[in-house]
Amino acid sequence: PDNVPNQDLLTKHLELSLTAVPDPFECHDSFGAHNNAQLMSFLDQFGFDYDFVSSTKSYKSGEFDDTLMKVLEHYDAIMDVILPTLGEERRATYSPFLPICPWTGRVLQVPVIDRNLEAGTFTYQDADGQTYEVKVRGGDCKLQWKVDWAMRWAALDVDYEMSGKDLIESVRLSGKI
């Protein structure tokens, strides 16, 4: 975004989770922490009673593990919901799971080529043709946002989430998942 300082810093950290990107404003541990602080400051102005939940911590601590396993278990059904909403090119490479490269920390957008429910893993192939097996549990992957949204609702027992009219179709889609 043009309204964020230190553009070179951001460019160097493309494809990383925001909690792995240094804060371009230089006042928090990460860009994710900066954005979370901004959100909490805004909510605090109105006196809302809320429990802030860090997505990164929830993925890494295992809080989302059971629900991630349900996504793995229902992978085909989820794909049946998502794929019709995507263009042809994106359908060819889409996966609800986004592995995090153990060497670079980059969030990879690669298709899943195999799944092992018993082991709780999926396999993907990188651009060089190498295959890698990734654990669903423990923070080795994330989910694409519409599936992530549905997963959070289930994992965190969310009954209602506000959204603007620009997200109505996404709410419906995530509700199907």
Each PLM stretch: what is its role?
Residues 1-79, 174-176:
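N-terminal Rossmann-like or analogous alpha/beta NTP/dinucleotide-binding catalytic cores
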Residues 74-77, 84-177:
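Alpha-helical recognition segments enriched in aromatics with Gly/Pro capping
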